[in-house]
């Protein structure tokens, strides 16, 4: 099965580089290229890609608003936001807009391919090296944590709540399984269950909710390795 990728970036050299990486990999193909947010929205509608690589800073319409409109349109495409580094203050907003993850632009070709495959599989890109730092940084800018727990969170079992806390720390399925002494299949089952109960699309949205609800706060968490 071929994964079709829409590349959205205002720099032609960047688009060309991504195209070369994608076309060199079996099972991946480029669905199209957009140089701004408006083109991204139009091509997402016209080409029906599986994955969209979305730059944040583009002319006419930025990647954040493009992401929001594509998600709101009901597109099945999974959106991977591209950023220069964690100083990019727009990444958090893009994730809130419905992106399924993000990747540094200087990632190695193999990392880009892996990210596309992860997103296409319906998962979210939550690498601890990037995700936790970014979410912690932007969580500090959030309003004071809520004094009451969102109703949906009360529907989670104790184990699902624990899984959500660990997800917010950027743990992978394998790391979650090791921490909880269960199989990866069991972890996936817990994640699917909590996403369904919370009415969320993917893990990224679950992590955002955990921070916004005060379930997790920036910095080391109880039980983290020293």
Role assignments for model-derived ranges:
Residues 42, 64-76:
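Short amphipathic alpha-helix used as the core "switch/output" element in two-component signaling
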Residues 33-51:
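Acidic, metal-coordinating helix/loop segments flanking the phosphotransfer/catalytic sites
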Residues 58:
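Receiver (REC) domain active-site loop signature in two-component systems and cognate sites
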Residues 170-205:
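Recognition helix of helix-turn-helix DNA-binding domains
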């Amino acid at each position: 099965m071929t994964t079709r990728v829409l590349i959205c970036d205002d720099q032609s050299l960047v688009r060309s580089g991504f195209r070369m990486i994608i076309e060199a990999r079996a099972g991946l193909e480029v669905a199209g290229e957009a140089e701004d947010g408006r083109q991204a929205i139009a091509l997402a509608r016209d080409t029906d890609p599986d994955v969209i690589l979305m730059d944040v800073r583009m002319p006419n319409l930025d990647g954040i608003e493009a992401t929001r409109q594509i998600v709101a349109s009901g597109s099945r495409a999974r959106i991977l936001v591209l950023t220069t580094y964690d100083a990019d203050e727009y990444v958090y907003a893009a994730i809130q807009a419905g992106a399924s993850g993000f990747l540094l632009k200087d990632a190695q070709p193999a990392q880009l391919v892996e990210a596309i495959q992860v997103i296409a599989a319906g998962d979210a890109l939550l690498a601890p090296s990037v995700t936790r730092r970014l979410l912690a940084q932007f969580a500090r800018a959030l309003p004071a944590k809520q004094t009451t727990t969102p109703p949906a969170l009360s529907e989670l079992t104790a184990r699902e709540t624990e899984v959500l806390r660990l997800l917010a720390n950027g743990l992978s399925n394998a790391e979650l399984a090791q921490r909880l002494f269960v199989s990866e299949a069991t972890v996936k089952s817990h994640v699917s269950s909590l996403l369904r109960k919370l009415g969320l699309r993917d893990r990224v949205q679950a992590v955002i909710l955990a921070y916004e609800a005060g379930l997790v706060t920036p910095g080391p968490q109880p039980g983290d390795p020293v």
